[in-house]
Amino acid sequence: METKVGKQKKRSVDSNDDVSKERRPKRAAACRNFKEKPLRISDKSETVEAKKEQNVVEEIVAIQLTSSLESNDDPRPNRRLTDFVLHNSDGVPQPVEMLELGDIFLEGVVLPLGDDKNEEKGVRFQSFGRVENWNISGYEDGSPGIWISTALADYDCRKPASKYKKIYDYFFEKACACVEVFKSLSKNPDTSLDELLAAVARSMSGSKIFSSGGAIQEFVISQGEFIYNQLAGLDETAKNHETCFVENSVLVSLRDHESSKIHKALSNVALRIDESQLVKSDHLVDGAEAEDVRYAKLIQEEEYRISMERSRNKRSSTTSASNKFYIKINEHEIANDYPLPSYYKNTKEETDELLLFEPGYEVDTRDLPCRTLHNWALYNSDSRMISLEVLPMRPCAEIDVTVFGSGVVAEDDGSGFCLDDSESSTSTQSNVHDGMNIFLSQIKEWMIEFGAEMIFVTLRTDMAWYRLGKPSKQYAPWFETVMKTVRVAISIFNMLMRESRVAKLSYANVIKRLCGLEENDKAYISSKLLDVERYVVVHGQIILQLFEEYPDKDIKRCPFVTGLASKMQDIHHTKWIIKRKKKILQKGKNLNPRAGLAHVVTRMKPMQATTTRLVNRIWGEFYSIYSPEVPSEAIHEVEEEEIEEDEEEDENEEDDIEEEAVEVQKSHTPKKSRGNSEDMEIKWNGEILGETSDGEPLYGRALVGGETVAVGSAVILEVDDPDETPAIYFVEFMFESSDQCKMLHGKLLQRGSETVIGTAANERELFLTNECLTVHLKDIKGTVSLDIRSRPWGHQYRKENLVVDKLDRARAEERKANGLPTEYYCKSLYSPERGGFFSLPRNDIGLGSGFCSSCKIKEEEEERSKTKLNISKTGVFSNGIEYYNGDFVYVLPNYITKDGLKKGTSRRTTLKCGRNVGLKAFVVCQLLDVIVLEESRKASNASFQVKLTRFYRPEDISEEKAYASDIQELYYSHDTYILPPEALQGKCEVRKKNDMPLCREYPILDHIFFCEVFYDSSTGYLKQFPANMKLKFSTIKDETLLREKKGKGVETGTSSGILMKPDEVPKEMRLATLDIFAGCGGLSHGLEKAGVSNTKWAIEYEEPAGHAFKQNHPEATVFVDNCNVILRAIMEKCGDVDDCVSTVEAAELVAKLDENQKSTLPLPGQADFISGGPPCQGFSGMNRFSDGSWSKVQCEMILAFLSFADYFRPKYFLLENVKKFVTYNKGRTFQLTMASLLEIGYQVRFGILEAGTYGVSQPRKRVIIWAASPEEVLPEWPEPMHVFDNPGSKISLPRGLHYDTVRNTKFGAPFRSITVRDTIGDLPLVENGESKINKEYRTTPVSWFQKKIRGNMSVLTDHICKGLNELNLIRCKKIPKRPGADWRDLPDENVTLSNGLVEKLRPLALSKTAKNHNEWKGLYGRLDWQGNLPISITDPQPMGKVGMCFHPEQDRIITVRECARSQGFPDSYEFSGTTKHKHRQIGNAVPPPLAFALGRKLKEALYLKSSLQHQS
């Protein structure tokens, strides 16, 4: 029996039928005889216009126009029908079954049957028919189809018109019920009626018409006779069918079943579906049954349909009401579940919450700061303990309950309540909490977030959100009820998830199952049904909120939720109106009963930043202009965008498909100017100054339309694009061409708004660029006033410059008010190709000599981009590098293949996500010869290839060999390759081992290798060099090394005769450095190791981190204090209080500093270098500044950091931060930072670097901003040395450009990546929760990295780790010890804990939500020995943001020392405080190898300046 929709054969039209006699609807124009009246379709009508329906009157016309996909062997037309209505002769919509009692007609859109995707061929008809019969198909497929037949064709009903939808949908559900009963009885004819109804209800549970499975069952019973007749009709058309529906006892029982509430449907139409014959429905009507009875039955069914619709609307209104109102929980109803009344007592002094925050502003609740509250308690205005439940779980207006709280506030540490912990304690806390005792203002709402196996409870005041840690012992009994209710909700989740259909469990079913829980179950309430139901209803708001947050839609809308909401509605409690607006006004008074008690001043308040007036003005003026009110929805969207950009959680942000990483998207194409059609007088004004290189006369001045244009001035040129502002160009020189045209050559002066600083730029400042062009003087539209500005540099000139700038701004404002032209100034060169702003090349601009430095740069770039032979054809130029025979070179690895010559491809190999497995370093080769192809020898641009011999690396042999070998070791071979010159990627050195630098340090920044072994690739064996083989090694060019070799390393030429490392510089010759936001000192350590910095002062707010800094930098003066206070103290000491913008609190704290502290403060002129990374609180996903309010931005520490730079005016300034710093707050913070440094007078360079490419085994992108005084040289970016797969370092620039700081190393780098085994493979075994600080190594270091990171250490410190709770430890042991294993590899089984509780080994919550969260990859994950460690965070845990934290072979979380090594800290580096403090110090640190690489480039810049000065 073929019943598939669209393939069922239909009956053909009998040629003897007199279709001309059929009844027609009143609106239709009848065509009486199709046979006698030929159909003529005009040429215009033959083609249906795309997306435009044709309207026709005759059915036959519609059939002909939609015949494009008609099957020739189908005797009867089949069509699709959409947007249709079945109506009577008066045009009134009618149910399909009404066909039994009268004539039914059709209107709609007819389409070809087989062309589902093509809706352009539809033909609309107003009305035709009549409808002869209808039938249901799709029984075998399980997908019902409704077919309607007229005398001419059969129509597959797809989509009804909107006005007909409700009527048709009801009939379609009847068809669905028929198909589901057919499916169930075909599988099991002997099933019971209850089982049949349950099966059908499960299958139809997705329907929006029914509220629950019970409603579906009632509907199926009401349609019993209808269903019986349809299936009985199948017996007649499918006689060989194994199931006999007519005599099936269950189907007969369904037909005869009487419902006390709903009258049976009375349609006894049986349809026969046959390939050869269809029986009309009216043939099956029992003639004995009176027509009025049949009509009454149909009317009754229509009333039933309408009643169902009303019920559905009522449910919808109930749901809508639940979104408008919050049902208040009365305290007396839940009193039995709580302890007897008790009062809050605390002898400790508590600080008013309002002192930590600044009240009085309208803020969005989503922008409030988030803190953690430990050791907390809640109470009312009488200090009586009170439950959280009396508070709303949604923001409500005018709540009539007052709840306050107290506790120890600390920075948000992600605390939560572990569901596996029987004591309702957090899994991430110690008993001692750092923070301060406070009392809260009125609590307005609270929420529960359900995250896998952690519960996060958060409450909100008007000042902040507080994530709750462990409650106080006094309050713990009041909180236990809340946690128990959470466990009840989670138990219900588990019940529902175990069902194949969640609709199977009604509210009553769930209550019964809760009664059956064992007494030792954490969700056990009672065995009595009434007690359980009372508990669930009175605590229903907690349960409903958890269901609302659950990601599974079916569970969210399950019958249990509907039933519980209905029960809560029936209680008739007070309803609070839910607030739609998220904005709140922070009040300035705290009504907490503890407000009358004495309190202390807090150090934790986010103090308004202490700033200089210059920085305050720049940021304040910007926010006075660009702080429009942003709708809360828009703010939310911005936040979501920024969260998605957070590279800290994603190791594979984008797929770069370029084979060669491009440093920057260059653009030297100048703006095209538009010629001037006006006639104006143009003549030279002055004598000839000289000639161009082409012999054309040069002039210094010209008169253009009465205006004087001079070399060194600025002119306006209109551009082709009318939407762009006119371009301003700096005049380099003017000349008269050979065809007597007066010409000008100039460089583009870019407006600040068109640079990376955007709207933060000063509208009067222009930036010189390297974009130049030559135009006719007649194209000039005018001149502008331009001042090539120069200011004396240094802290001693700061006040003088401020006065001059103030007068300049006043003059500009006056000119603007009087409508006078803008006077521009220029003091910097903007180079997007180099990612920065540089001092003007004053010696090369405005000379009028015919020379243009920009043209020279373009010529050099074009020359570098060429690949060509040298003149003697014995060498190669490629990418600006000249290669000669005998040179050691880098080759892209995808050019070296087993089958010889094969051009590289940009297609990326399949890699394990984020682990660098599969990435290869450059292949080191020696250039043997340049082969010029024979056919191109005579051509000027001859084609050529290079012949190379290959060196193998240890990793080419095996993983074990790579692990145990020096990363700079190579093996010579006889393998040769002939490759295109594009494969070459640079030069390196290969030396004998005893010619290597004596002091090789980590990280490696030199391209030097050594070779002393031969590798036979044919046998795979390593051998000593054959006696007859002569390998020409690199020549040693390092004079220091030559002296060392000659003197055997005893002396290096110093007068003292003390042995000194080649790169070591005495501290007195280094830059005196002030490290702000110093942390434990990772940045300072790397810079000092590079030999460029001497950290004399450090400022760190957190005491444990400050102590760690002091331990590792004992000579530095460390201020463990707020940097705002320190800056205020310095400015007071120097007598510059008038220039200091700070709070009264900062001044009071300065007064409390002792004289010893004040005497050690750094002063302007003493610090050559300021470095640091401002806290990221403002740049994280949860911040209080995203609304752009200036009053809130003033608390950003970035302002204080920039003010240090302004006040001290050091030679160099370095800012480090997370990648998101560039995009935070729509990029405004980044732009204002750049604008501030430029306004101070600095040269500025910006970029993003990946620490993993500098020798650490973890991905860690950092934004770096360098600033150098106008007299210094800006450091270049360090070259990435290790392959690492973590792209995403591009910074977007205006005009469609982007800046790539350094090349991407995914396709090759000088060295391989550092692996997990390299990093931690030598560390001894430790157990879960290890706390012993000092240990023995027990083994010798194996890898090159281990040898460097250990140094001379004999005692291993801080190889300690956090402890896993019992369940997580069991899970850890069950995670397979193989690469990439995580929670998905856990067996699906239960485990019994020591307390007797039975828990699921595989977290159910993860299993059910995996599809929406990238499979929760990495949670409970094991590290891969050959991969990299995850991003170092402040609190590693298996359910954290970086869940891959299990050791590759041991059953524990990675230790403090292992995390430190992943950041590149040497084993000698000490950390301070608890295990948690140490993880925090490491997670917040700058990787020392990255700092070392930056320091080396800074040292090069200093040497370059010294060299330039020596030359001059």
Curated annotation (Swiss-Prot):
Biased composition (Acidic residues): 638-662
Cytoplasm among keywords: no
E.C. number: 2.1.1.37
Top-level EC class as recorded in UniProt: transferase
Active site (catalytic residues): 1176
Domain annotation SAM-dependent MTase C5-type: ranges: 1071-1505
Disordered: annotated segments: 1-35, 634-678
SMART domains assigned: BAH
Tissue specificity field: Expressed at low levels in vegetative and floral organs.
Residue span, BAH domain: 707-841, 909-1026
Keywords recorded for this protein, A-Z: Chromatin regulator, DNA-binding, Methyltransferase, Nucleus, Repeat, S-adenosyl-L-methionine, Transferase
Family that this chain belongs to: Belongs to the class I-like SAM-binding methyltransferase superfamily. C5-methyltransferase family.
Function: Maintains chromatin CpG methylation that plays a role in genomic imprinting, regulation of embryogenesis and seed viability. Required for proper patterns of CG DNA methylation in dividing cells.
PANTHER family: CYTOSINE-SPECIFIC METHYLTRANSFERASE (PTHR10629), DNA (CYTOSINE-5)-METHYLTRANSFERASE 1 (PTHR10629:SF52)
Descriptive protein name: DNA (cytosine-5)-methyltransferase 2
Name of the gene: MET2
